[in-house]
Amino acid sequence: MTFGRGGAASVVLNVGGARYSLSRELLKDFPLRRVSRLHGCRSERDVLEVCDDYDRERNEYFFDRHSEAFGFILLYVRGHGKLRFAPRMCELSFYNEMIYWGLEGAHLEYCCQRRLDDRMSDTHTFHAADELGREQPRPAGPEAAPSRRWLERMRRTFEEPTSSLAAQILASVSVVFVIVSMVVLCASTLPDWRAAVADNRSLDDRSRYSASPGREPSGIIEAICIGWFTAECIVRFIVSKNKCEFVKRPLNIIDLLAITPYYISVLMTVFTGENSQLQRAGVTLRVLRMMRIFWVIKLARHFIGLQTLGLTLKRCYREMAMLLVFICVAMAIFSALSQLLEHGLDLETSNKDFASIPAACWWVIISMTTVGYGDMYPITVPGRILGGVCVVSGIVLLALPITFIYHSFVQCYHELKFRSARYSRSLSAEFLN
């Protein structure tokens, strides 16, 4: 067929059931490359390379594409507004439609370009983690297959709490150890607990008892928990595919930070036998033992909510930095003004609580976050007016990035939940084979 020489004066484009009539002259210089290519087609074979089907009698070209997306694209190329995403349509799907018709990402409005970049970045990260979790090195020979399969099952049992019944039991036991260790840590700081422990030992053995934390009931429980965490960490390191990647993971670094202080404190008590040396090391020992609080972060391995929180903070670091800048700027302004109004003017009602700007910063941050301890407050009329403005400003500033953080949290939650469900299905099918 030859366009522009005889025949019908117009052609019909049928895109997903929606029909559009175009003149031949308009078709020749049409902004969409795929549509304009129809003008140069000389045979039906050339036409079918451009569209999905062709009706010679009605001179109609069929495209099995998204009709609503093409409608938005057609409005854009005709000069009616700017190109934005179609409602209720995935950004990546709309972008694929743009590529099909011959447009690029640069044709999108800036806000839509940012949405597309964020979605492509998230999808790339998601698929990279997916491929990393799916890839399995092939065994060298038939004899290596059973051991490789066993190591893979062990790795997934320790890494994926929802992969099997054994993984769920192991995760439950680990959670119990974390909870027990946290309860013992909190109880060991109670005055009644320490008094009861001191009454059960003799005065002569008190120094040796203090130097050996394993002799206390709480020390015994701590040693058992540390033993479990250490064994779990070692096994997970042995069965991991990539040892370097294992060491770099944030949760594994937290495990190391939670376990190492115990062994350091044990070594310090062994090498500081004299009481004077022990007293000098007492503060260090208490700090190291208090680092057991990091164990609570181990729960992130077993609870999707904590994983969602960490992933949200990672993706929203720009919004968090913006929030921090807002707070710092407002705190600098309000602290300087409050110090001037309450103390710097040397009035008879000088407020000593606002003697310096750093002291006023405490009042500003407490007021902006609407906590209001009441330990210090303005007493002058201008200071109270400034306090009201400070509170309202804090509410507004804190609310600005909340929308971005909320949407990111919901997106991260659905991604992690979908990934967990997919692992459960794939692993169940694999273990049944």
Curated annotation (Swiss-Prot):
It is found in: Cell membrane; Cytoplasm. CDD domains: BTB_POZ_KCNG3. It comes from the Eukaryota. Residues 1-165, 240-250, 303-317, 414-433 are cytoplasmic. GO terms for cellular component: endoplasmic reticulum; plasma membrane; voltage-gated potassium channel complex. It holds the Pfam family BTB_2. The transmembrane segment S4 functions as a voltage-sensor and is characterized by a series of positively charged amino acids at every third position. Channel opening and closing is effected by a conformation change that affects the position and orientation of the voltage-sensor paddle formed by S3 and S4 within the membrane. A transmembrane electric field that is positive inside would push the positively charged S4 segment outwards, thereby opening the pore, while a field that is negative inside would pull the S4 segment inwards and close the pore. Regulatory subunit of the voltage-gated potassium (Kv) channel which, when coassembled with KCNB1, modulates the kinetics parameters of the heterotetrameric channel namely the inactivation and deactivation rate. Potassium channel subunit that does not form functional channels by itself. Reduces the deactivation rate. Moderately acceleratee activation. Heterotetramer with KCNB1. Does not form homomultimers. This is Voltage-gated potassium channel regulatory subunit KCNG3. It comes from Mus musculus (Mouse). The gene is Kcng3.
